[in-house]
Amino acid sequence: MTSTATVTVPPRITAENVATLFPEVDTSLAREVFPSTVEGSAKDSEELAGYDEEQVRLMDEVCIVLDDDDKPIGSASKKACHLMTNIDRGLLHRAFSVFLFDSNNRLLLQQRASEKITFPDMWTNTCCSHPLGIPGETGAELDAAVLGVKRAAQRKLDQELGIKAEQVPLEKFEFFTRIHYKAPSDGKWGEHETVTDTQILVDYILFIQADVDLNVNPNEVRDTKYVSAQELKQMFTQPGLKFTPWFKLICNSMLFEWWSYLGTADLDKYKGEKEIRRM
């Protein structure tokens, strides 16, 4: 006798149903960061008991909730967007990954702080975070979305690494593409830049080449390191080092190819992709 497993596919998330499926989503979208004193804030959450106070506060930041086509349809707290229970039901939000290279074409890596709620102590690219559901960082069309992501990247490079805006001006950021990933963390928290049935990504990949001064925020970053492509490949072979899943995905699928053309006109052919890469 043959048994058939039943697979439940999450409904397609749209502007019309997102508030019904996820009551924590605010469909007004453009709003200020939730203050930590509001009812239902992350500091009052049982799921976050025992975590670092500052990292818990940051879970009240407002992420941009998207439909399958990377169009903003609402906003929700970082906590709501990173709960695997919501991710598994298809809650989608926008993210970015910055790859900063110095004048010697070395990539700046960071090791995430032990205090981080998701992926603590793992090595990753220079900066990875989320544009917020606030004026200036939210965009519906691709050009506006890219500008919003660049502004968010500039903000987070300062907040995490102490890199001042004048050293990373918006016009120096280069947008390459968007990718999909779903990266479980510890079963409760994760990253999901798609819905499971269509695999539409919203992780915006940015390059910037600049020599910068670092003033690392120890609550965000445990360590930093500049590496060549060969040195990074050697790091990947060391069993004692752990890397964020999206970083290894980007490296193995596209980064090393792009990196080989850094500083040449040949790199231009990879920039500004309109299509979303489904990984």
Curated annotation (Swiss-Prot):
It catalyses: isopentenyl diphosphate = dimethylallyl diphosphate. Binds 1 Mg(2+) ion per subunit. Mg(2+) binds at H82, H93, E191, E193. One of its GO terms (cellular component) is cytoplasm. Its cofactor is Mg(2+). InterPro entries: IsopentenylPP_isomerase_typ1, NUDIX_hydrolase-like_dom_sf, NUDIX_hydrolase_dom. CDD domains: NUDIX_IPP_Isomerase. Keywords: Isomerase, Isoprene biosynthesis, Lipid biosynthesis, Lipid metabolism, Magnesium, Metal-binding, Steroid biosynthesis, Steroid metabolism, Sterol biosynthesis, Sterol metabolism. This is Isopentenyl-diphosphate delta-isomerase idi1.
